[in-house]
Every structure is written in structure tokens, then in C-alpha cells.
Amino acid sequence: INNCAYGEENDECTSLVNQDSDGDGTSDGDEVYGLNNTYNYTSDPMEWDTDNDGLNDGLEITNCVYGEDDDECTDPNNEDSDGDTISDDNEIYSYYSNPMDTDTDDDGLSDGTEVTNCIYGENDNLCTSPIAPDSDYDGLSDDIEIFNCIYGEDNDECTDPRELDTDNDGVGDEDEIN
């Protein structure tokens, strides 16, 4: 901004005639000085998506719909606002999980763990759901099925949180455990 001469073509300068140089829906002034919201986030007025997470800065700064009071915003300077290893863009558009909560479904497993540790199914390609605490709806939460391994000769076998009846014996997992 300091080395910008009026009328000069310079990709590093904000526009003198356009209040939103990068076209992200937030004025250059709000991006530089911070929009008056809970977090007062700033972002680069020359970058449509400062953190390269797939969400434009204007959306991240103004779309504050997370948290108990729907007043939490994703951070336009951090592609993973909650630090769960899933980008904000993927949480919103791919997994429908909360980019401001590391464990959206409160089942004791982080969203990142649920979508990256896909160890179920014949090809070990099935994951638990980051938005359903009981992915198979069998009455046992995913964390209980994963961490309470009480079957087999050495009590080291677990029920599958993706299957209603892991051993296919006609008795559901919840009934067998209870």
C-alpha cells in the first residue's frame, strides 16, 4: 500500500476505485483493519482466499454460524480453524461437520480421526461419521465400539461401529453387549 502510485498497474496494491479489490465480498478496509465481529479477524485484501482452504475470506469473516450462540466464525488465516486435521472447506462441504468443533458429534472421536482412520469393511475403506455419534445406529456410540474391545479369546476384538450386527449372528451389537 505504501509503494502504490495512483494510475500504476500493480498487483500488490488495493484498488482506489473498488472497495473490494479481491472480490471476496468484504471491503479492503475490513480485511486490513478487521471486521467488527467476535474475533476481529483480518485477511489479505488482495487474496480471495487468504488461507487457501476453499472458502473465500468474505464468507469466513461474515458467516458466523457456529458455536452455541451462532457467533463463531472460521479463521480466514487458518485453513483448519479447529485443528482437527480437516480443512474448513471439507468440513462444511464434504463432511457437513462443524469447522469450529474438533468433535462435532461429541462421541469422543475427533472429526479428523473419524474421516481418516477408515479401518472397517472388507477393504478397510469405511469410516465412522463425524456428525453421528452412533454411525450404525445400533445403540452403541462409536467410541464404545472402538475402545471397548471385550470379545474374542483375549478380549481384544471390537464390534464394528459401521455394522448393526458385527458377527452377523442375528443379535444386534447393543443386545450382545448389554
Where are these predicted regions, by residue range?
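Extracellular calcium-associated, cysteine-rich motifs in secreted modular proteins
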Residues: 1-178
